[in-house]
């Protein structure tokens, strides 16, 4: 068994992690550390947390054998941990429940959050509605355009959504603005960070709340593959919360490979990607030391991914540590490969996965072919793809006017015009590097 005890008492994972914050936030961070230390092993707190997961979220989430995909790809059997079936449609709710419970015990009445794909924002707005807390969500304006269904969901749930116009107008900038809000309103405000980044204790705390994913898998997988665990566990990595959630309970199981899949965007050599662990260098970002995409002057560089949730120039410090000690591997999947996996999973298994999760599915399809049929791969399907349908339709050149909301405009005299009924098939993709892909991804590209 792999001996692993991280982080240390100061919040460091080797040389990574720590707490790099302004003096104005020092008291708030210390208050949070003390509160989490008090409640993280408190029986009453844990009982309430697991009750909420069971009765509000619907846990445990099932594991599904993607049998048709496995047959067609050949090689290893592919299994999916169905976090997309959670209430709100992703893994994010696991963490927001835990942090909101902590906020209430600390007497905080106002919650702020950052979001990229919108799933963390929706999960935060959801739990704030349940607990009667004020909710403000910061979201880059580019991501607001890409993820408009989730923006409306947040507003329906009573949250105030603040589009961020600074910088690249994506997740990094939303996090910056949320930090500024926290500094200005520290007395009554609790910041629910959505990933395993930020100053200590956030990376540890978010990991702990999300580790329910891997803990369930340890109990569930032997039912499918006998008295053993999968040969590989795969998850997409942006900030890295869904990956740490499934990796952490498996770290001790040395026989299981842990593989994180970063967004390679238009290719790792193109400069238009979000692969911090493969192309970044150690630096400080958003309160912790980790791998950061930066230029020769140490300035954070612009990132790109078709997936808003992976479009981030850093990564959680525990991932940086796992990479350095060799316990986890990190690879890249391009926009085009993720899109192909998105369509393939739809057509072979009837599952519409998030574009973030599709990166992990794409690598599982590659890896399975190199393995034996008696071996197994477990993929963390971190979220559902409802939020991405518009993006995928645009990228695929699909006729999206067939939406129910548009049918009344399209139909005259009871007859459906040919231009609305004979559009290109949803699954049609432009060739790799083709003009349709280049044009469609320009929304997320950086000038």
UniProtKB/Swiss-Prot annotation:
Alphabetical keyword list: Amino-acid biosynthesis, Aromatic amino acid biosynthesis, Lyase, Pyridoxal phosphate, Tryptophan biosynthesis
Pfam families cross-referenced by the UniProt entry: PALP (PF00291)
Catalytic activity: (1S,2R)-1-C-(indol-3-yl)glycerol 3-phosphate + L-serine = D-glyceraldehyde 3-phosphate + L-tryptophan + H2O
Keyword Amino-acid biosynthesis: yes
E.C. designation(s): 4.2.1.20
Stored InterPro entries: Trp_synth_b_CS, Trp_synth_beta, Trp_synth_beta/beta-like, TrpB-like_PALP, TrpB-like_PALP_sf
Superkingdom of this protein's organism: Bacteria
GO molecular function: tryptophan synthase activity
Signal peptide: none
Modified residues (N6-(pyridoxal phosphate)lysine): 92
Functional description taken from the UniProt entry: The beta subunit is responsible for the synthesis of L-tryptophan from indole and L-serine.
Family indicated by similarity: Belongs to the TrpB family.
Pathway info: Amino-acid biosynthesis; L-tryptophan biosynthesis; L-tryptophan from chorismate: step 5/5
Sequence segments annotated as region (Disordered): 408-447
Keyword Lyase among record annotations: yes
Protein name: Tryptophan synthase beta chain
Organism of this sequence: Polaromonas sp. (strain JS666 / ATCC BAA-500)
GO annotation, cellular component aspect: cytoplasm
Cofactor: pyridoxal 5'-phosphate
NCBIfam families recorded: trpB
Oligomer status and interactors: Tetramer of two alpha and two beta chains.
